[in-house]
């Protein structure tokens, strides 16, 4: 039908229709291409959370906490400061150190995470990571990286590392080579001083150095999806005795926080601020 109609048209009208049709088709193709080229983005302001303490546990006041992680029901901790840095397995109920490896005095211990039968610990300015046997704490190997080492966590396929800036780095868990990087932001503002990390149900929880709050980060986009306000959880005495240390126990769906040289470790529950 349309073909018969086109046959009886004059040349000028036919040319005009063909040009318009070509423009519409091209525009449609361009729109499709633009749709596929744009990455999904987060929308809306971050959700605000408050907390309540479920239970309080003792914590070693000589533990300058830099990393905290649960694995198979056991709590592991990395402590910092030159000459005092350590890897520990800690009894949650009474805070006693059940097992410990002291780092050589030239290393400042930092972020910590677990992968299968191994523990991975960062150092601060030395730019070296150590891999340990989870059971014996025997050293299995080491690796290097180009930035400072602050926080470390594992999302099931990649290590995620912070360096005190607004960046998160993704590392291959076998080769420890960097495979990706994102910048963390709240709206358009970068979020800096990102410290200890914990992967919780598809998001990254991050301590922010010298702030009593935790950022909840979308690890695909770097967008801050939420803030947990921990104001008043503990009044520290020293300028460096700040909130640092997040551990999530998947087996019990429990969240724990502590700080550097704090006397307590807290199990907390969070709720949306009204």
Residue map of PLM features:
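Hydrophobic, well-structured mid-protein blocks that either form specific transmembrane helices
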Residues: 129-187
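Short loop/turn segments that connect beta-strands within beta-propeller blades
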Residues: 91-95, 133-137, 173-176, 218-222, ...
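Surface loop/turn motifs at the tips and blade-to-blade linkers of beta-strand repeat domains
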Residues: 56-61, 100-105, 141-147, 182-189, ...
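Short coil/turn segments that connect the beta-strands within blades of beta-propeller domains
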Residues: 72-73, 116-118, 156-157, 201-202, ...
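Signature of short aromatic-glycine-proline-rich micro-motifs recurring in repeat-based ectodomains
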Residues: 65, 194, 239-247
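Conserved beta-strand positions in repeat-built beta-propeller and related beta-rich domains
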Residues: 77-82, 119-126, 161-165, 206-210, ...
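A short helix->beta-strand "capping" segment at the edge of beta-propeller domains
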Residues: 40-62, 92-98
């Amino acid at each position: 039908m349309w073909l018969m109609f086109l046959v009886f048209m004059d040349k000028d009208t036919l040319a005009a229709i063909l040009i318009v049709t070509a423009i519409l088709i091209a525009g449609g193709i361009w729109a499709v291409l633009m749709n596929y080229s744009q990455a999904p983005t987060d929308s809306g302001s971050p959700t605000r959370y408050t907390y309540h303490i479920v239970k309080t546990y003792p914590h070693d006041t000589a533990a300058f906490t830099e990393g905290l992680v649960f694995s198979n029901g056991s709590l592991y901790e990395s402590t910092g400061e030159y000459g005092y840095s350590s890897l520990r397995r800690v009894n949650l109920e009474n805070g006693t150190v059940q097992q410990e490896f002291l780092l050589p005095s030239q290393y400042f211990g930092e972020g910590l995470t677990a992968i299968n039968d191994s523990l991975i610990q960062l150092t601060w300015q030395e730019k070296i990571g150590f891999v340990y046997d989870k059971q014996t704490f025997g050293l299995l190997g080491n690796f290097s990286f180009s930035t400072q080492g602050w926080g470390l966590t594992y999302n099931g396929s990649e290590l995620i590392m912070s360096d005190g800036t607004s960046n998160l780095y993704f590392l291959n868990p076998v080769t420890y080579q960097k495979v990706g990087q994102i910048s963390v932001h709240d709206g358009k503002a970068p979020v800096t001083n990102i410290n200890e990390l914990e992967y919780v149900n598809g998001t990254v929880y991050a301590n922010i150095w010298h702030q009593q709050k935790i950022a909840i980060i979308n690890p695909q986009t770097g967008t801050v999806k939420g803030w947990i306000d921990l104001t008043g959880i503990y009044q520290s005495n020293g300028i460096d005795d700040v909130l640092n240390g997040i551990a999530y126990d998947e087996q019990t769906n429990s969240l724990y926080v502590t700080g550097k040289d704090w006397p307590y470790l807290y199990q907390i529950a969070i709720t949306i601020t009204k």
